[in-house]
């Protein structure tokens, strides 16, 4: 499960990148919206997508996204290896702490800007969340050592995002390998064949 410390933290982008990472590793993964942002439905109205109105599934750029929380039991019956849940933000009134903590992997997307730090600090100091991971978004290289020092004993659970201009285009990030160290079961891509056959060279006669 992925959750942001506050709004506009890049939580949804990070969740979608996790889906793309798992797909790259050869697994069937999907995105599940468990918040009130309406992101998935907005995508369906704006872009050329495939829409399953019964399950509330929108497919875009090879990512299957679900938005009907009342259909969650039906969604869980689908043949996926991984479900990536986007819980929106920690400050939302409908955020479910219990549901978030029940997930196998728990990730808080946090920030270091002045407008974000109070929310980030609240999460870090909250004893309710101990076995969770923290991912700082929009961080410069200069800030990273300072933030790791600031995180103290939680530094080992702290990671950083990389610049991701397009939510649906995977950008390699070593943090994913540590957060979800899964075996790569993807099949190697076949080398494209040329249109023409290579001519066999003539054997040279010895003198």
Please provide the spans of the model-predicted regions.
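Generic hydrophobic, helix-prone segments enriched in Leu/Val/Ile
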Residues: 43, 65, 147, 175-180
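Generic hydrophobic alpha-helical segments
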Residues: 69-73, 120-123, 171-179
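Conserved catalytic-core segment of NTP-binding enzymes
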Residues: 78-82, 87-172
